Amino acid sequence: MFSKKSYDGPPAGYGPPTGYGAPTADYGYGSPPPGSYYVDDAPQLFYKWTSPPGAVRGLQAGVLVLCIAIFACVASTLAWDYGYGLGGAYGTGLGGFYGSNYYGSGLSYSYGYGGYYGGVNQRTANGFMIAMAVLCFLAQLGLLVAALSKSGATRSRRFYLAVLVLSAVLAFVMLIASIVYIMGVNPQAQMSSGYYYSPLLAMCSQAYGSTYLNQYIYHYCTVDPQEAVAAVCGFLIVILLCLICFFAQKTRSKIWRYGKANIYWDRAPVVQEGPDVEEWVKNVADGASVQDETATLAYSEKPTSPVAAPPYSYVPPPSAGYYPSGTYSSRGDQPDRALSASPVHGEEEEEKGKDQPSRPPARRGRRRRRNPELDESQYETDYTTAVESSDERDQEQWASLYPPITSDGARQRYKQEFDTDLKRYKQLCAEMDSINDRLNQLSRRLDSITEDSPQYQDVAEEYNQLKDLKRSPDYQSKKQESKVLRNKLFHIKRMVSAYDKVRG
């Protein structure tokens, strides 16, 4: 089931590649396209609204708002066209005001205004503007919903190419619609001849200077406020669509340059971490440490995942170990015992071990425990950071060695000693963590293979060697030293915090 492998060296999965052949199908992608280059260690946070894709989404939302504004403004003026209409308004208003000999009937003028005089029919301009606003609204709404759906197809260069092309087409059409709308709602914009050759311009000029002003004539001869707002919104949409094209192309270029591996479309989950000791040291250096005393210098005793354990963090000791082979039972379910026995008792145990014949290595490598719930790693306590009963006695000792701070010079001296001890404390914790992580990894591996397999003996042998290493005087001295340093650092921290509070 598992091939026999040695744990004395790094795993085979790490190291420089031995060849540069074609990539296998395990990775799902090949070399970058020709002409592009990928920049390592340059993550692109595309989930932010300040990124190019975020700017595209924000501009699309702005286009939707402007389209709604255009629809509302233009729709509010349709009553003049369809309620009284060009025929009704001009038939009753213009025909009655100027007489039939000037324009003839109202119906003939309504057609003459739009066709005979070569102008733009206001009803047609309103309809064209509303149609383009609705088309732009639906297109940008579809693109925005697709971008927010977080599907794989919308996170590619092809999608933003479609955004670029569609936005460019909409910008061109919307520009034409805005110009046509201005020509339709403003009669003076389409009159270039004089009064004698442009009766409509003459009519509007006489209407402005007359004391009697028909409201229908005034509507068709002037630009209403809502019509002006609609025209301005049309040109703003053209500008926003051009910006969408720019940021869409910028998104495509970033994907091409940095590669999909460096593009982060979603925010990484935030992991809750404990108090950062180094951050506290910086605050102490700046004189701004006002943290609570209970935020100790705890160093996590929970081992990291075996998958995340560093592959080069530990080199197993020789098979001889720190003790003779007869001093330790082959069973792996014995919990760790502290080295509290007297030297005489230790010598007696050593003599008994010499008298007994040594066990064969294969037998010593056996570990009879099969229930993972009884794993001794769940019950052992290595170096701990919790408050113990002996801390109360240690506080008196540290209080005599490090009394309360009374000057800035003493505070600086405490801080320098704190920095030195902190480095040593973290180094000890890292060394012990590497051993514990390796033990947990081996324990899980022993649970996953059968005792009759050949690799079980090798794994169990290394597991027992690590257990011997944890019982060694060197490991126990490091464990005790880390505990002493932890209490010392905690005491110095309280002294510095108390001094900072008094000084204000």
Swiss-Prot record:
Belongs to the ELL/occludin family. Residues 324-396 are annotated as: Disordered. Residues 51-253 form the MARVEL domain. Keywords: Cell junction, Cell membrane, Coiled coil, Disulfide bond, Membrane, Phosphoprotein, Tight junction, Transmembrane, Transmembrane helix. The modification Phosphotyrosine is found at Y379, Y383. Phosphorylated. The keyword Coiled coil applies. The C-terminal is cytoplasmic and is important for interaction with ZO-1. Necessary for the tight junction localization. Involved in the regulation of the permeability barrier function of the tight junction. The second extracellular domain may also be implicated in the permeability barrier function of the tight junction. The chain crosses the membrane at residues 58-80, 124-148, 159-183, 228-249. One of its GO terms (biological process) is snRNA transcription by RNA polymerase II. GO terms for cellular component: bicellular tight junction; cell junction; membrane; plasma membrane; transcription elongation factor complex. SUPFAM superfamilies: occludin/ELL-like. Residues 396-504 form the OCEL domain. InterPro entries: ELL/occludin (IPR031176), Marvel (IPR008253), Occludin (IPR002958), Occludin_ELL (IPR010844). One of its GO terms (molecular function) is cis-regulatory region sequence-specific DNA binding. This is Occludin. The keyword Repeat does not apply. Residues 379-385 are annotated as: Interaction with TJP1. It is found in: Cell membrane; Cell junction, Tight junction. Its main location: membrane. Localized at tight junctions of both epithelial and endothelial cells. Highly expressed in lung and liver. Expressed at a lower level in brain. Residues 361-370 have a biased composition (Basic residues). Residues 1-57, 149-158, 250-504 are cytoplasmic. May play a role in the formation and regulation of the tight junction (TJ) paracellular permeability barrier. Interacts with ZO-1. Pfam families: MARVEL, Occludin_ELL.
